[in-house]
Amino acid sequence: MSIAASQDTSAARGALASARRGASRVAFAAALACAALSSLVVSPAQAAPIDSLIKSVKFDDVDGVNKLLAKGMDPNSVDNQGIPLLVLAAREKSDKVGAALVANPKTNIEIQDKAGENAMMMAALNGDIDFVNLLIAKDAEVNKKGWAPLHYAAANGHDDIVKVLLDHSAYVDAGSPNGTTPLMMAARGGHVSTVKLLLDNGADLTVKNQIGMTALDFAKTYKEPDVVEGLTARLQQMQQK
């Protein structure tokens, strides 16, 4: 990943983390409690193979991963931070390993990390359309309850992924636990083309989250004048009809 891409992704993750904090702590805790995370209990004898497996995932070493899986390693294993291999592959843009894991019949493609993030969400955030398409081809859920892949793609302005998700019936006004929509995330990030794409696909710019903020409010709060101008123009068009 380039430095610029890494900075963009970090900024988007920061925006998502901040938006998450706006949700009710009780509701968010409940959502996490309901998230199914298949974790592997690692014995000391298995520690080295697990470390090797995780390293192979990070470096997109598909041969290394396949060898360890052939020896009986669980494709739903997690690292020491509770991140499942498939989610880790999506975070690291390890597409070859991702394809191998998805092809494994034992892999849970909806598996989540401790924050409730799955591989589709991470691939959407990173702009990895190949990984997104790989998951969609395996019938991965595009309409995850709460924070959804569309929020993550919109947060970083990945229009190609936004379009793919919408083409596969992603709900354009998906609400996070605190009612934040993909349009709000795109507006917050100043992604003009993403805002337009979402609006053209039916996003409701009048929706408010739990603290009463609309997409326009987000754009104003985070000082995104181009988005403010565009959303204001859309509102005026609506009022004239």
Segments (PLM) and residue ranges:
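Ankyrin-repeat-protein effector appendages
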Residues: 2-18, 25, 42-53, 138, ...
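Conserved ankyrin/ankyrin-like repeat signature
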Residues: 64, 96-97, 130-131, 160-161, ...
